[in-house]
Amino acid sequence: MNYKYKTVLLKLSGEALKGDAEVYDKKCLEDIASQIIHLVKNGLKLGIVIGGGNIWRGKLGENIGMDAINADYMGMLATVMNGLALESTITKMGYDKIKVYSSLPIKTVTDDYNFKKARIKMNEGFISIFVGGTGYSYFTTDTNATIRAIEIGAEAILMAKNGVKGVYDKDPKQHKDAKFIKKISHQEIVDKQLRIMDLTAATLAKDANLKIEVFDMSGDNNIIKVLENKLESTIIE
């Protein structure tokens, strides 16, 4: 199968796993897993970073008086849970060439992150799920996704959004007159402070000349469609 990229980093939000459920929706997990399996079976080298927002938000920490550093680590642990949930779903659907790499050492259920090992395994057809954030507080999963994409030699980050087809000049959920942007530079994202991703991640991607493609994953097989160039999206480069 000819995809527009050979190696990509897929960035998923934690909310993508929950649907209308409280934490996880079986159908959402299976839909994402089936697309991932299809892609890697057809030759795509794929790394994945998942957020933890379906389980933990920093605001929850604030509400109970938790300091920001501990709250960040709880968010990192939430990404571990999400990575294991996706791994389990993919394995149950019959694809067992998969590794979960954690920046936080949890040897019982994950492998310690090592970009060289991840590259080797991806060349062997393994899916690599990167969890635990960067392993340090004050960094978002957007930043983690950008770092991992650079380290595995990805040609692009596929940034999956829920119900938003790409980048707009302002929040389309709050402003009916928001204008869709087909193509934009990393620097414009930073200068205009567009909240499609955090600015540290945008700056890192700019310095590494790493393309980011923002798309709406909520339609049928949209992860596959964006790689087949059959879906409207925003290119950041």
UniProtKB/Swiss-Prot annotation:
A biological process term (GO) from this entry: UDP biosynthetic process
UniProt catalytic activity: UMP + ATP = UDP + ADP
SUPFAM superfamilies xrefs: Carbamate kinase-like
Xref: CDD domains: AAK_UMPK-PyrH-Ec (cd04254)
Enzyme class: transferase
Keyword line: ATP-binding, Cytoplasm, Kinase, Nucleotide-binding, Pyrimidine biosynthesis, Transferase
Source organism superkingdom: Bacteria
A single Gene Ontology CC term: cytoplasm
Database matches in InterPro entries: AceGlu_kinase-like_sf, Asp/Glu/Uridylate_kinase, Uridylate_kinase, Uridylate_kinase_bac
Coiled-coil blocks: none
Keyword Cytoplasm belongs to the record: yes
Subcellular location: Cytoplasm
Residues noted as binding ATP in the record, renumbered to the chain: 11-14, 53, 57, 162, 168, 171
EC number: 2.7.4.22
MF terms in GO: ATP binding; UMP kinase activity
Stated regulation of activity: Inhibited by UTP.
Annotated pathway: Pyrimidine metabolism; CTP biosynthesis via de novo pathway; UDP from UMP (UMPK route): step 1/1
Chief localization: cytoplasm
Chain positions recorded as UMP binding sites: 52, 72, 134-141
PANTHER family assigned to the protein according to its UniProt record, in alphabetical order: URIDYLATE KINASE, URIDYLATE KINASE PUMPKIN, CHLOROPLASTIC
Family affiliation: Belongs to the UMP kinase family.
NCBIfam families registered for this protein in UniProt: pyrH_bact
Quaternary structure and interacting proteins, as annotated: Homohexamer.
Function in brief: Catalyzes the reversible phosphorylation of UMP to UDP.
Identification of the protein by name: Uridylate kinase
Species name: Mycoplasma capricolum subsp. capricolum (strain California kid / ATCC 27343 / NCTC 10154)
